[in-house]
Amino acid sequence: MNKQALLFYPLLGVVLLGLFVGGLAYGAVPIPLDHVMDILLGKGSDKIAWQNIVLQSRLPQAITALLAGASLATSGLLLQTLFRNPLAGPSILGISDGANLGVAAIMLYFGGTLGRFTDWPISGYMAVILAAFVGACVILGLIIYFSAKVKNNVMLLIIGIMIGYLASSVISILNYYSSTDRVHAFVMWGLGNFSGVSLEQLPFFGTCALIGLLLAILLIKPLNALLLGEMYAANLGIQIKRTRIVILLCTGILTATTTAFCGPISFVGLAVPHIARLMLGSSNHKILVPVTMLTGSCVALLCNMLMVVPGNNTILPLNAVTPMLGAPVIIYVIVNRKNIQYFN
């Protein structure tokens, strides 16, 4: 294993822990770190309000940010390797737009429930997660199909963008014919946040995210084989079609779960894999996958803290913060593309 990677594991672990605990203390209501630690250790606090803020609000929010960041970053890495394209990602290729369309159909047209169409009523966040998953997987399936037809990566990106425009067009029509309350709910969901997962919903969200992340870890060997090209991967015994389907499923789980609960989050899935590659100087997925997960969690936790305006109760939308960190990385990657190791 790369010796440099061995240094990044503990370093990222310390940064992750610091951002996690810092996020519990920092907010519209500042809470001293010693009180935060007492609350986490079960000792409680003489201020009940602080205890409720930490346990009921900030702790689920921090765990959500940790898992969502890892999920989006891993999803972006899988797509970049699958398409051998450094600009591939859930948002760029229209996958997030597919999830948005599914959620829009549920929230704007069906009113957040599928119960009237099924014997088993599915309502609330269950309907949203199902709709996001189906929407994301449909778009992913289309991208995989077109990737077999179009060999030029730039053309494939354009197709993904066009699919995103089509999804946005349908969403606009649904918005036009929906009630004000439903449109407002959808717009608020679309701003992105990590506070949409309650303590009761956290086990479901965490289980879905961890399943996707575990599946990504199991894909490390096939991903490394794909770096050599599909022909060489097939000669190494990798079943290309099955590997594509598994990557499709894994990316669908990670993207749909995060998008359903947190809204469409930009740049994390696109930028974080590049940050990990720049740190490691390697595209070996044995070290790249875990470092990407850790880096994604750190970036998401940092964004979660930056959303809070100091000295003010205002909370910025998540998608107003992520481009500040992600856009400079992508610009740097484009400018220095020839000097960065991608798929070798």
Task: Locate the predicted segments by residue.
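Alpha-helical transmembrane segments in inner-membrane proteins
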Residues: 1-344
